[in-house]
Amino acid sequence: MKKALVAVMCSAMVLGAAGCGTSGNEVKTGEISNVEIAEKDVNLFVKDGTLTNTGATFILANNSDKDIQYDEPYRIEVKENGEWHKIDVEVAFIQPLYTLKPNETAVLEIGWENGYGKLPDGAYRLVKTVNYDDVENYESFDVAAEFTIG
């Protein structure tokens, strides 16, 4: 069933990875984010030495005792006056579904220039939604990696 679901999602929801984003080095700040980052055994962080204003390599680590699932979409938020704000941008993603086993990591090469443009100096976080792969106890939550440009 899971394989069929993945196949359907991959073939039916291919939207492309390009979006309508910002141009130049500006960030169009939106409303205050209501995302709550879960304190779970699943973590997201920037791999040392990979951060630029157009992308980075992120590590998604599953330190839990359960399989987790994740997909391509992410969002970037900017910190202003001590609060996280959404960045007004529309980005389309392909929709494959990945599974990460307990105590495994995944390397995520993320280039955001097509959607978010070149990020100016500031504090940001990349947010991804993941869920435990448990049909009886479905639980979806957000993980984030904070980073600073400049």
What are these regions (language model features)?
Residues 91-117:
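Intrinsically disordered, low-complexity Pro/Gly/Ser/Thr-rich segments with frequent PxxP/GP/PP motifs
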Residues 1-4, 8-9:
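Positively charged n-region of N-terminal signal peptides that target proteins for export
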Residues 21-94, 99-101, 129-150:
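Primarily secretory-pathway and cell-envelope proteins
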Residues 119-129:
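A short tyrosine-centered beta-strand micro-motif
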Residues 16-19:
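C-terminal motif of bacterial Sec signal peptides marking the signal peptidase cleavage site
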Residues 8-10, 32, 125:
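N-terminal functional modules and adjacent low-complexity/disordered segments of proteins
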